[in-house]
Amino acid sequence: MAVKRSSKLTQTAMLKQILKRCSSLGKKQCYDEEGLPLDVPKGHFPVYVGEKRTRYIVPISFLTHPEFLILLQQAEEEFGFRHDMGGLTIPCEEVVFLSLTSMIR
């Protein structure tokens, strides 16, 4: 599955939605005065991966990688961007996610 250039506008809108959603995650965390989670460094966002929904903090630069965009498309197809978990859930096994992110880094 390849990311099409013609869908650049759609991808941009999707990325903005993801970042907006991720900046206002869950009510269980401590937030700064701007409403951002204290445990997420600037330029990063949390994702939940695998059956146990393990939380990972990833840099926003991942949003420019075609392989990561494929995971985001799968997440949208499976969960949409509004679901009970409150954050962005990636529908793959942790081992696959860790392998992919280590290649991107």
Curated annotation (Swiss-Prot):
The species this protein was found in: Arabidopsis thaliana
Gene Ontology biological process terms in this record: response to abscisic acid; response to auxin; response to brassinosteroid; response to red or far red light
InterPro entries (alphabetical): SAUR_fam
Gene: SAUR16
Induction context: Induced by zeatin. Induced by auxin. Triggered by brassinosteroids. Accumulates in reduced red/far-red light ration (R:FR) conditions mimicking shaded conditions. Repressed by abscisic acid.
Alphabetical UniProt keywords: Cell membrane, Developmental protein, Growth regulation, Membrane
Protein's name according to its UniProt entry: Protein SMALL AUXIN UP-REGULATED RNA 16
Function: Provide a mechanistic link between auxin and plasma membrane H(+)-ATPases (PM H(+)-ATPases, e.g. AHA1 and AHA2), and triggers PM H(+)-ATPases activity by promoting phosphorylation of their C-terminal autoinhibitory domain as a result of PP2C-D subfamily of type 2C phosphatases inhibition, thus leading to the acidification of the apoplast and the facilitation of solutes and water uptake to drive cell expansion. Triggers plant growth probably by promoting cell elongation. Regulates branch angles and bending.
Cell membrane listed as a keyword: yes
PANTHER family: SAUR-LIKE AUXIN-RESPONSIVE PROTEIN FAMILY-RELATED
GO cellular component terms given for this protein: plasma membrane
Protein's cellular compartments: Cell membrane
Membrane-traversing stretches: none
Domain of life of the organism encoding this protein: Eukaryota
